[in-house]
Amino acid sequence: RICDDSSIPFLRTPQLCPKGQDVCYKKTPIVKKFKWLQKKGCASSCPKDGFIKIFKIECCTKDNCI
């Protein structure tokens, strides 16, 4: 799988994911002034938000999908 791992919105830096990490994800803070703190990368499954929902989490299973 190839996923973007840039933490900067609108910047794409594709990376080859390690074996077993077949999900691309993006975690973006819900509070708009912190959107630049997003995190993108590879995972073995879609990450979950904690008890207090502070992130919008998107996941997909195709190359460069987020």
Swiss-Prot record:
Disulfide bonds join C3-C24, C17-C42, C46-C59, C60-C65. One of its GO terms (molecular function) is toxin activity. Its main location: secreted. Expressed by the venom gland. InterPro entries: Snake_3FTx, Snake_toxin-like_sf, Toxin_cobra-type. It is found in: Secreted. The keyword Disulfide bond applies. The keyword Disulfide bond applies. Keywords: Disulfide bond, Secreted. GO terms for cellular component: extracellular region. No toxicity is observed upon intravenous or intracerebroventricular injection into mice. Has no cytotoxic activity towards C2C12 cells at 100 ug/ml. Belongs to the three-finger toxin family. Short-chain subfamily. This is Clarkitoxin-I-Mdum. It comes from Micrurus dumerilii (Coral snake). The lineage of its organism: Eukaryota, Metazoa, Chordata, Craniata, Vertebrata.
